């Protein structure tokens, strides 16, 4: 265990008196400059007796002055608070009423205790807490550079002394600044190491930095938390450069007053010797008590940068040492780096094989005889692992809801069963295998009939590395993490109500997941293959098709080109293969979504393999747009390219609010004989995750009315989709009720805009009226 500490010593001018205090919330000693003494004052009407029954209730807390910090920062430093108000209405302290009702005993002990736990007691004024609040506020301002700050708490009572409003009056005084920063004891660093050390400093420099380990700060206000951050950064930097024995005690910060409004800081460091990685000793324990032990020794590296990995495995039959070897991010003989040790631990945990992962470094005793400076000592690395049971079987029940299917079914509600088997270490190298089978049925809620039955089978294999021939990308790109996933799925669906069935819809995908940094990830889908074989049941044309697109004599969709496209989309067997690259950058919590960003860009090229087969092999003279496979006209394919950009930002809005924004841009373009892209690669707009004022897939294309006037079709689901999609959204979320019924209650206001359009190659809706919309962008 490395115990850390820093000393901050302020040297005042000789003529000034000096007092040393330990600020709250800091492990540093700071010189406190003489200033106005803090006082706790009360108005003449304040309550003198502090007994429980006569203390006033705090109705409000205000801050007068202290504009250097946000209101939320000041509120977070004090413990004197008023009771919560329902929806912010003055005097409407709902939770106090609940507490007092439960405390009255009129509803019995059990109900009373439940009400008291849901409510909160009256916020009575506590002078001891108030005095501590004054000290905490003073410490905040002094630690942040306002060395002469003083705080006074004023209590104003009303209603005969029963209520009190607390005002913290802050006199911050003039700020002080960093002037010059100097690092001492780092002469052993190379010029490149010095440049990186200065470039990453938490205290910005005023001008160009050199390698002298000294620079003038860029008018940054003096801040003890900033010095602590710089210490943490310096510790991390040195530990990643081989100085494994450095601790917080090794760094001392001497803060000297250089002028009435500025300080110089000398950071004095004792780095200790520089170390290299040594041999790796691994102990693995498994859950199979009947299995004996085995011991393997692996050679790591060659020449000077070489060593051994000694693996001892107990009660585990399947695990191979190569899994651990592949997860190592360091090499024996290389310079010690704490980051590489942590990355090794993270990669071992990411395999999912181990329930316990512990990586430790054996640092020698500082009293041992020193070695020659030119010979760096090697540090042995110890890894202790415990594997999890490999086999898992899961049975689950689920519910589902669908609406607007083909614009015919208004609402479907269903349930299903699922069974899955997982093997966490299939071949001994961390391969996670999963196979699952699920089935579901759904019915129309209003008519109380069964409408859809579905059966789905899926399987996947995920390995914690990049497979050949892509394995070299891990070291070449210096990836933070990497894995490969192979998956297959097959779906069969039958809907008597829609007179429609999918005999088989299958897909297969090989994905390379490359995490460059903790926030940036690349996803490469190499051969993504999918096929769909729809079929129609008796009565499909009469009950469904004529209702959606009409007959030739009474068309609902008047454009014959678009009528033919709908028939092709939903009744013809189709094939698609795609290469897809996704670049994703995100630092936002996907569940809370309170602060951060999420950016995603996608480039996709599809159906070019069947296009090349059709053009070069199957029918060199013509390009038919179909593969002669199966019965009938064969498999339909449509080559295309597809681009997507999705940007989302989340920022705090006040103390309990979030301002969220989203911009989505999508473009799809056919590149083969067809003038449209596959229907499952088009864009749709409308619904809960899109433009929320419209139903699912109800918007577009453009402003066109795709259904003929007077048609009986309802819902007007956009059957065509679009080749271009633009959407923007702004949303404000604010928590209005906190901790009520064990939950926080929020309201949201949003503004959505967007639509989809036909692209330049799509013929759109043909019309003789130049003023009638065609659906094109």
Functional labels for PLM-detected ranges:
Residues 16, 327, 351, 398-400, ...:
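C-terminal transmembrane beta-barrel domains of outer membrane proteins
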Residues 2, 55-57, 147-149, 162-164, ...:
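Residues at beta-strand starts and edge strands
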Residues 127-157, 235, 340-341, 500, ...:
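Extended amphipathic secondary-structure runs
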Residues 18-403, 412-414, 436-448, 474-478, ...:
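Periplasmic polypeptide-binding modules associated with outer-membrane biogenesis and secretion
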Residues 237, 241-244, 517, 586-594, ...:
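Secondary-structure boundary elements
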Residues 1-9:
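Bacterial N-terminal signal peptides
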Residues 19-23, 196, 202-209, 317-318, ...:
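Gram-negative/organellar outer-membrane beta-barrel architecture
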Residues 12-13:
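Bacterial signal peptide processing site
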């Amino acid at each position: 265990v490395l115990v850390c500490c820093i000393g901050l010593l302020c040297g005042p001018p000789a003529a000034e008196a000096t007092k040393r205090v330990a600020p709250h919330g800091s492990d540093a000693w700071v010189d406190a400059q003489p200033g106005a003494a803090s006082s706790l004052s009360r108005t003449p009407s304040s309550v003198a007796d502090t007994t429980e029954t006569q203390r006033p209730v705090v109705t409000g807390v205000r801050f007068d002055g202290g504009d250097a910090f946000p209101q939320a920062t000041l509120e977070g430093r004090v413990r004197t608070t008023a009771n919560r108000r329902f929806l912010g209405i003055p005097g409407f302290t709902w939770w106090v009423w609940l507490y007092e009702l439960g405390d009255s005993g009129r509803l019995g002990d059990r109900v009373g205790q439940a009400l008291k736990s849901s409510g909160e007691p009256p916020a009575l004024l506590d002078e001891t807490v108030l005095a501590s609040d004054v000290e905490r506020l003073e410490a905040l301002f002094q630690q942040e550079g306002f060395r002469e700050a003083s705080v006074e708490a004023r209590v104003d009572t009303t209603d005969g002394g029963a209520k009190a409003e607390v005002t913290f009056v802050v006199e911050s005084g003039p700020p002080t600044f960093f002037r010059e920063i100097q690092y001492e004891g780092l002469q052993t660093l190379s010029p490149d190491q010095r440049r990186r050390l200065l470039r990453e400093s938490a205290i910005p420099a005023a001008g160009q930095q050199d390698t002298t380990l000294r620079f003038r700060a860029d008018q940054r206000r003096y801040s003890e938390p900033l010095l602590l951050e710089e210490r943490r950064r310096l510790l991390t930097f040195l530990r990643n450069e081989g100085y494994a024995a450095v601790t917080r005690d090794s760094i001392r910060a001497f803060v000297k007053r250089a002028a009435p409004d500025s300080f110089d800081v000398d950071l004095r460091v004792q780095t200790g010797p520089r170390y290299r990685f040594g041999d790796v000793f691994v102990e693995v324990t498994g859950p199979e008590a009947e299995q004996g032990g085995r011991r393997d020794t692996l050679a790591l590296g060659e020449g000077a940068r070489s060593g051994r990995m000694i693996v001892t495995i107990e009660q585990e039959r399947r695990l191979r040492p190569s899994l651990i070897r592949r997860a190592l991010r360091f090499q024996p003989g290389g310079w010690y780096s704490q980051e590489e040790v942590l990355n090794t631990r993270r990669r071992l945990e990411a395999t999912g094989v181990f329930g316990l992962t512990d990586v430790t470094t054996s640092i020698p005793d500082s009293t041992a005889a020193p070695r020659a400076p030119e010979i760096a000592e090697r540090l042995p690395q110890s890894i202790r692992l415990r594997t999890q049971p490999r086999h898992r079987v899961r049975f689950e029940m689920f519910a589902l809801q669908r609406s607007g299917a083909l614009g015919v079914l208004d609402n479907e509600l269903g349930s299903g069963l699922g069974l899955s088997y997982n093997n966490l270490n299939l071949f001994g190298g961390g391969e996670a295998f999963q196979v699952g089978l699920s089935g579901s049925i759904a019915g129309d809620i209003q008519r109380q009939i069964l409408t859809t039955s579905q059966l789905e089978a899926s399987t996947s294999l995920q390995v914690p590395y990049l497979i050949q021939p892509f394995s070299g990308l891990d070291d070449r790109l210096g990836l933070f993490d990497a894995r490969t996933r192979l998956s297959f799925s097959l779906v069969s669906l039958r809907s008597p109500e829609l007179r429609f069935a999918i005999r088989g819809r299958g897909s297969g995908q090989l994905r390379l997941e490359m995490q460059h940094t903790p926030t940036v990830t690349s996803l490469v889908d190499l051969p993504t293959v999918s096929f769909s074989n729809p079929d129609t049941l008796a009565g499909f044309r009469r009950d469904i098709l004529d209702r959606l697109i009409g007959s030739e004599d009474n068309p609902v969709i008047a454009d014959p080109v678009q009528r033919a496209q709908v028939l092709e989309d939903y009744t013809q067997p189709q094939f698609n293969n795609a290469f897809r690259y996704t670049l994703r950058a995100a630092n936002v919590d996907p569940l809370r979504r309170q602060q951060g960003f999420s950016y995603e860009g996608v480039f996709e090229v599809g159906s070019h393999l069947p296009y090349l087969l059709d053009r070069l092999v199957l029918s060199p003279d013509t390009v038919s747009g179909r593969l002669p496979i199966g019965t009938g006209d064969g498999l339909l394919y449509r080559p295309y390219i597809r681009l997507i950009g999705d940007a989302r930002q989340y920022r705090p809005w006040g103390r309990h609010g979030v301002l969220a924004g989203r911009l989505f841009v999508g473009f799809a373009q056919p590149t083969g004989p067809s003038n449209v892209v596959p229907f499952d690669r088009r864009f749709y707009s409308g619904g809960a995750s899109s433009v929320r004022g419209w139903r699912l897939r109800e918007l577009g294309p453009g402003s066109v009315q795709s259904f003929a006037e007077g048609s009986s079709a309802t819902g007007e689901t956009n059957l065509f989709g679009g080749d271009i999609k633009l959407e923007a959204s702004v949303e404000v979320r604010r928590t209005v009720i906190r901790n009520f019924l064990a939950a926080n209650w929020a309201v949201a206001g949003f503004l959505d805009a967007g639509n989809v359009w036909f692209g330049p190659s799509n013929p759109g809706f043909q019309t003789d009226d130049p003023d009638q919309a065609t659906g094109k962008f």
